[in-house]
Amino acid sequence: MSNLSRRNFITGGAIAALGGTLAIAGCAPKGESSSTVAGAAGEGAQAWTGTANGKGGELTVEVITEGDSIARINLLKSRESYGVGTAGIDVLSDLIVKNQTLNVDMVTGATVSSMAFLAAVSDAVDASGMKSSEWKKREKAVPQAPEGLTTDVDVVVVGAGGAGYAAALTAAEAGKNVVLLEKLGIVGGDTILSGGAMAVPNNWFQKRDGIEDSVEKMAEDMIVGGDHVGDPDLVNVICEGAYGAMEWLIFNGGVAWQPHERFFGGHSVIRSLIPEGNEGSGIICKLDKRAEGLKNLKVCRNTKADELVQDASGAVVGLKATNTATGETYDFKAKAVILAAGGFGSNVEMRMRYNPEMDEKILSTDSVGATGDCHVMAEKIGANLIDMQYIQTYPTCDTQTGALLYVGNMRLENRAICINKEGDRFVEEMERRDVISNAIKEQTDGIGYMIFNQDGLDHTDIATVNAAEMDGLFGRGQLAKGETIAEVCEPFGIDAAELQKTVEKWNGYCKDGADPDFNYRAALNPIEGGPYYILAYKPSVHYTMGGLHINTDAQVLDSDGAPIPGLFAAGEQAGHKMGTNRLGSCSITDVFVFGRVAGANAAALA
């Protein structure tokens, strides 16, 4: 559909012909300009456009009116994050059309996208001659609980991220009645915000490429990468279950993987699969669709877990929760409860309680929902917390917002080198995250930079997949482009003469096939010829290694090491698996392995 000026309109049959276009959905097929639809329009309808600035740039909507009503809303242009911003837009569009009001709350977890969408719709409503100010005074519309929700179930799962979906779907596939609670207005947790990479030893790409790997080798990498603090038994469960979890995602979840792998820091070999779309949304959206098709699984958004319920023997037999949109309270009765609500990276007070260095000056990549609520809730009934002082920072993050920078994956694609303001390399680019983060802190201004060129960028799909991110970084001065090294250094004040020497030295190492300075462990690719790019970055809190102490059956343990009957935990919610530091792509493996373990064992109790 071509763009319209905001005061032009289409009438009658032309709009009726749009009836078959794709309905809006937070996990609908991805694309910059999609047709987002809520409601239906008939003869006499008119179309009005409105525009606002969202998180990913300009957002344009088309509001279809019939008389004084909004018949539906089409999204003409959007670069909001797939499965996150788009999910918030989905919720608001549905509320607006069904309830004929603009008096709606922003969707938690997608606030910026929600605000932009509402502003654009308001703009279009004003263009139609109606007054958005009047629409905003109408009766408030709020999301409702799923139809047919019951509080007497077999299994309650808290947290609709990767671990939560794995647990809930596994229990539901075993024939149990399951409810999955999510306190935000969107699902996905940190999994949907991630790149979705999953470490899997002995996968078919390794066999195709002649890469020797084993469960034991991956387990050793994880244990060494965590300084031998993680529980080897828990690590072995993750590594042994990785291949099966990958197959489950394919055959039960419909997840598709790209035909290549990525090397992550701290691993001894390349073993990490990348989902279609290069994002965790390529996993979560498939699992959410699978959940929608199961009658015995209800996903409750805007529903916060408040209190675990125990019987006289101490067994967990239910959970109290509140719908934050409607104010309704629930007293769920269940045979088992699974906590999969992630870590506490977004809770500065809690971070500082366990590690005073992780103060408010350090931003976070994490979901706004990663606040440790369930850590506290479980601790109140005697659950043991372990390794809480170990908090990981991700090295290549936005210096202004703290968001993880996917352009920074040029490092993981072996197409960039890390430099400082003096123009020198200061760390091996494929080192552990904590090693790189600590090295960045020692550099001038606590900021690192990476340099790559157009040829390197063209060898990846990073520019295509992350176009909106790159545009934003250019606009805010965190990414620069220049025909020469001297030109690209200028915006950052980097020593161009020294960087020229550094790049020439690197290119020589690539020719020789060895890096005597830092022992680079992956493929050595030269940076020869412009245009050149430089990206500025700094570390942000990314993952909390500590959490509820569990055993290999995902049962939560008390301070004496005994299982608390009926209580399970999985994913970042559970600690003592990663040790002092997590290797990249092992979290996705963990959430789906232990999510399935928790789901299966909880189902066995029901």
Regions found by a protein language model. Name each.
Residues 151-153, 327-336:
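Core beta-strand elements of the Rossmann-like FAD/NAD(P) dinucleotide-binding domain
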Residues 146-161:
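Beta1/beta-strand and adjacent pyrophosphate-binding region of the FAD-binding site
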Residues 74, 307, 498-581:
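A glycine-rich dinucleotide-binding beta-alpha-beta segment and adjacent secondary-structure elements
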Residues 240-328, 347-350, 398, 510-529:
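Conserved redox-cofactor binding core of oxidoreductases
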Residues 1-17:
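N-terminal secretory signal peptides and thylakoid transit peptides that target proteins
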Residues 39-139:
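Active-site- and interface-proximal helix/loop "cap" or "latch" segments in soluble metabolic
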Residues 375-379, 383-494:
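An anion/pyrophosphate-binding glycine-rich loop and adjacent beta-alpha core
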Residues 332-398, 594-597:
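Glycine-rich loop(s) and the adjacent beta-strand/alpha-helix scaffold that form part
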